[in-house]
Amino acid sequence: MSYIKSNLELYQQYTAMAPKLLARISKLLMICQNAGISVPKGIRNIFEFTWEELISDPSVPTPSDILGLEVSFGAPLVVLMEPTFVQVPTLKKPLPPPPPAPPRPVLLATTGAAKRSTLSPTMARQVRTHQETLNRFQQQSIHLLTELLRLKMKAMVESMSVGANPLDITRRFVEASQLLHLNAKEMAFNCLISTAGRSGYSSGQLWKESLANMSAIGVNSPYQLIYHSSTACLSFSLSAGKEAKKKIGKSRTTEDVSMPPLHRGVGTPANSLEFSDPCPEAREKLQELCRHIEAERATWKGRNISYPMILRNYKAKMPSHLMLARKGDSQTPGLHYPPTAGAQTLSPTSHPSSANHHFSQHCQEGKAPKKAFKFHYTFYDGSSFVYYPSGNVAVCQIPTCCRGRTITCLFNDIPGFSLLALFNTEGQGCVHYNLKTSCPYVLILDEEGGTTNDQQGYVVHKWSWTSRTETLLSLEYKVNEEMKLKVLGQDSITVTFTSLNETVTLTVSANNCPHGMAYDKRLNRRISNMDDKVYKMSRALAEIKKRFQKTVTQFINSILLAAGLFTIEYPTKKEEEEFVRFKMRSRTHPERLPKLSLYSGESLLRSQSGHLESSIAETLKDEPESAPVSPVRKTTKIHTKAKVTSRGKAREGRSPTRWAALPSDCPLVLRKLMLKEDTRAGCKCLVKAPLVSDVELERFLLAPRDPSQVLVFGIISSQNYTSTGQLQWLLNTLYNHQQRGRGSPCIQCRYDSYRLLQYDLDSPLQEDPPLMVKKNSVVQGMILMFAGGKLIFGGRVLNGYGLSKQNLLKQIFRSQQDYKMGYFLPDDYKFSVPNSVLSLEDSESVKKAESEDIQGSSSSLALEDYVEKELSLEAEKTREPEVELHPLSRDSKITSWKKQASKK
C-alpha cells in the first residue's frame, strides 16, 4: 500500500487518533509524576505553535516526513526561535526566582519547507528523526511543567486570599474548555499528532498504550484542551477530580494540598506567589451570561408566570427520504461526543489487524446516541415551536404580554422559511396561497371581519364579526398537507399540525389573558374607527349645514328683495370707467372677468308696488333712448363687493349712483307690473331659464342694459316636447351652471356677457300668431340672439355645427363680435322656412366656415384666439359692397343670408 494518502483519509485518521494521543500524553505526565516531577493542572502549548498554524485549512495535501501522512496546515514559514512565555503581572510582591530546571533547548519549529521533504527509503533515518523529536519533547515538557506548576500555585494562593474554594480553579478550566469550537480542537489534535508521532515508540506500543487509556479520554474526562485568547496558545489541562475528592475532607493547608514536593524543597513562600487568570475573556462572558439569566429569571418571577417545558419528539420511524434529507445533521459530530470515524478510518499497513478491531469497538462505545427528531417544543417563557419531520420550522408562536396573546407565524416546508400565514396578538392576519397565484392572499382577517379571495383576486366570501347577516359560523382552510386553520369566531382561531401520526393544536386568537387588555384595546380600536367615521360624518354634516344656511339666506334675501327692505351700493361711474380702462389695457376677455355675486346679507331696495306702477311709464319712456346701437364695447363687469345699507339711510341721502333693481331685469316681474299684479313674490328664476311672453317682449328687449350682453332666446313648444326637449335641456343646464350660488339671478346677471331666455310658442300668454312668428317667422327649435335691441343671429345650426354646449358658446361670442363690427339683421327680417338649394357661392362660404371651425379649439378657454381670427376676416369683408349675415335654414346645415348695402 502506498504511503501517500488523500487529505480526507488523513483528516479522518487524525480525528480518530486524537484520543489516543491524549492518552499517551497523559501517560507521559504520570511517568513524570512518578519520577518526582509534580503534575500540574495544565500544560502550555508544548511546541509553541501559533493559532494560525493550528486552524489552517488542511485541504491542500503536501508531502510530509511522517510515514503515511499527507497534510498541510498552510501556516507561513517560522524561523528558529525559543519558546516565549507570558509574563505574569505582579500585584504586590515580586515573583520568586524560578526553580532549577534543565537547560531549555532551542525548539526547532516545523515549517512548511521542512515538511515538504521527501520520504527516506531507509528505516534508520526515520528512527534517528523520531529519537531527536522525543528528546526535544522531553526537555521542553519538563520546563513547561515547572512553569505551569508555578502558575497553579499562584491560583491556589489567590483563591485562598479571597475565600474561594480551591477546586473552583479546576472547575474553571473544565468549563472553559467546553467553549472551544470543535474544529479548533480537531486542528489542535492534528498538530499534536504531527509532533508526537516523531517519538521513538514503535507502532505496536503506540496502539497498545492508547487502548489502555481510551476510556479515560473525552470532554467529560479529566483531560481538557483550552485555548487562551489573550496569549493565542492552547493548554492541555488535567482536572484530577479523584484527587480533589480525597483532599476535601482533610484539614491540610493550601500549601499541603497544592504544593508539589519540588517547590517545597526549594522553600518558595506561598504568600509571595501571584496569579493571573488564564481565561479572563471566557470568565467575563460567562459572568455576563449568568447575570443576564438571573435578571430574566427575576423578571419572570416578578410576573409570577412560569410555563412548563414541553420537549416532544417524533415517535414514528422516519421515512427514508427524510433520513436522507437530514443525513448531514446526523453525521455532524456533537460537542459532548468525540468524533466517531469507525470503519471509515484507515490505518498504516504496519499496524496489526487486532488493533484495528479493538479500536473500532472503542469507537462504537463512545458513539453518540441516536439523534431525536423534534416535533413540538415549548419553553418557560411561553414560546412554542412545531417542526416538520425534515427539521424545518412549521409553526412559531412568540408571546407578548403573556402566553394568551401570541404572534403566530406559519412556514412552508422549505429551508428558506417561506411564510404561509401571519397572525398578530388579536388574531388578525392573513394567509398566503401555497402556490404562485395572481392574488397572494387567500384569507384576510381584520378587526371588522374577514374576506376570502380566489386565485384571481376576486372576493368569494366576506363577513363581519358583529353583523347579524354576515356572521361567520366556521371556516376550515388547509394551509398545506400538514397544517389546517380553523376559524369559529374572532376569539376562536386554531391551527392544527399533523404529521407522522403526531398532532398538535395551537390557539392563534387571544384567550385567557390575565392582564385583561385584549377587550379594552379592541374596544379602543373600534372606538377610534368609530371616531373616524363620526369625524367624516361630522364634516359632511357641517358641509350640508353650510349649504342649507346659504339656501335659507338666499330665500330670505328674496323675501327682503320683494319687500324692499335693503338696498345695494354699486360703484360710481368714475370707478366703473377706471375699472373698464384697466381691463381694456390688460386685454382681458369679458368672459374671463369675475362675475358679480351677491352673497348673504346683500339685498336690493325695491320700491313698493304703487310707486313702481306710477314710475313705470317714465322708465319705459327712457328705455329706447338709453339703448345704444354703437359697436363700441362697454365692459361694466365689476369685482367690487356690494355694500348693504338700511332703507332709512338710503331715503335720507340717495346718491345718483345708487339705484334699485329695474323692473326690466326679470321678465316675470316686468309682466306682473304690466298686468298690474302683485310683485311682492319677486323673482323666481332660480332653476330654469326665464320664460318671455309677448306681453313684455318688446319692452324687455328695449330695456336699458349692457349693449355687449347677448340675449339668447330658445324657441320652444310646451305642447311638442319631443322636438324641443334637447334645446330645453341644454338651456337649463347651462343656466344652472351660470347662476350657481346666486340668490337673485335676474338681478345679478346684469353684467354677464350673455343671458339665456326661453320663448314658448304654445304659451297661453302669446298672441295669435305669436309675435316672433309674425315678425321673424321663427319655428320650434330655433335660437335667436339679440344685442343692443338688434337681431344678430337666428338658426338651428350653431357655429357651423349641430346643437351643443360648446357650439352655442362659440356662436354667442361670434354674435358679440358681429355686433361690435356693426353686423345685424333688420327688426322685421323673416327667416325662410321652405327648403332651398344652396347656391355655389353659399356652399363655398359654408365649407370655408366649417374648415375654420375645425381648426379652432372646442374648449371655451380658447375662444379668444378664435374670435381674433374671425375679426380679421370680418374686417376684410367690410371692404366689399355687401354684408354677410348668419341666419337659419330649417332643414339644411347652414343657410347664409346676404343683403345689399343699398337695401340696408
UniProtKB/Swiss-Prot annotation:
Q: Mainly localized where? A: membrane
Topological category with respect to the lipid bilayer: Single-pass membrane protein
Pfam families per UniProt: FAM194 (PF14977)
| InterPro entries linked | FAM194_C
Q: Where is this region: Disordered?
A: 247-275, 328-360
Provide the alphabetized UniProt keywords: Membrane, Transmembrane, Transmembrane helix
Which superkingdom is the protein from? Answer: Eukaryota
Bias kind Polar residues: ranges: 342-360
- TM ranges are 778-798
Kindly state one GO CC term assigned in the UniProt record.
Answer: membrane
> Where in or outside the cell is it found?
Membrane
Q: What is this protein called?
A: Uncharacterized protein C3orf20
Please report the organism this UniProt entry assigns to the protein.
Homo sapiens
The uppermost taxa in this organism's lineage are:
Eukaryota, Metazoa, Chordata, Craniata, Vertebrata
This protein's gene is called: C3orf20
